[in-house]
Amino acid sequence: MKLLVIGSGGREHALAWRLAKTPGLQRIFVAPGNAGTARERELENVDITDPRALADFAEQERVLLTVVGPEAPLADGIVNLFRARGLRIFGPTKEAAQLESSKDFAKRFMARHNIPTARFATFSERASAHAHIDRHGAPIVIK
């Protein structure tokens, strides 16, 4: 059994390290990995970041499951791509990843489903944002 962990941070290192304890595991690939994962005997760094190339790699290596750590590949739709190719992958779809990747989407989702959240407003033009600040004053948080 082979697994692929996508990411280069400490979270992915910890995840891959723990997954390496799985009985019957042949190999864990980490793409692209980091200096820490490079030192782990059970892990193999793979210098690939392109989603299509990662899917190709998963197919060629017959990876049983891919786990995605970072937000960016999720927001870019890597789960959708892998699933469209019949590959097993753990993580939210591009659409669901917006809860993490888009503050506006998350706030609107919470409002729509009556989930408590701070008041918010979203602007696409600077003048509208300034007018809102002038009307409501401080304290205010801008993101």
Cite the ranges covered by each PLM segment.
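ATP-binding N-terminal substructure of ATP-dependent carboxylate-amine bond-forming enzymes
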Residues: 1-95, 127
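Active-site nucleotide/adenylate-binding loops and adjacent lid/helix of ATP-dependent enzymes
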Residues: 4-5, 99-142
